Amino acid sequence: MGQKVCAHGFRVGPTLIKGWDSVLYAEKHYKTLFIQDLKIRDLINNSFNQAQISRVLIERPSNKSIIININAKKPNVIIGRSGNEIDKLKKAIEKMTYLQEVYINIHEVRKFNIDAAIVAQTIALQLEKRVSFRKAMKTAIQASFKQGGQGIRVSCSGRLGGAEIARTEWYIEGRMPLHTLRADIDYSTAEAITTYGVIGVKVWIYKGEYTANKRYN
């Protein structure tokens, strides 16, 4: 049943490859802050879905400040003209968290073809545009190897091609050592809203093995 384990959650920890998406300390108000983090992520992802956001990291160094790091394929969509969009986002977060010190950092994802979240979103976008699911999956696989990926697995589930009966189809190329803890495996999901219903997309990308001199966040 090892394939059923989330590749991210399996590797989260200070001595492993993956770090936490939320960094905070709270004894009594953990639940409130956790819900705030979920709302902030939903706000960012829903407001800037065209930016193809990979990851939203939220840090709370103190009770009075919050630092939000956004990794995206198209950072200009989030920033907007003369920084208008990011100012609106900052005010919305200030209103939501009641904090005056809100810092937002935008980072561009350069190797987006080996970023599982962006690859999954790209495939979902193509499915919504009625591109063949097989073509979308094979294109993503080829692009990932060109940017240094060592293995990729892509899965699509739903009424593929408008079929009456839902099914799951997947392709795998290269290595995918899901049981190896030192393996750097990126995993993400996305949904394509089509006229036939929702199609789920899952992507696993193997980038190589973790070494003592190299840590992925």
From Swiss-Prot:
GO BP terms, alphabetized: translation
Xref: PROSITE patterns: KH_TYPE_2, RIBOSOMAL_S3
Record bears the keyword Nucleotide-binding: no
Key words, A-Z: Ribonucleoprotein, Ribosomal protein, RNA-binding, rRNA-binding
GO molecular function, one term: structural constituent of ribosome
Record SMART domains: KH (SM00322)
Stored Pfam families: KH_2 (PF07650), Ribosomal_S3_C (PF00189)
Family stated for the protein in its record: Belongs to the universal ribosomal protein uS3 family.
UniProt name for this protein: Small ribosomal subunit protein uS3
Species for this entry: Rickettsia canadensis (strain McKiel)
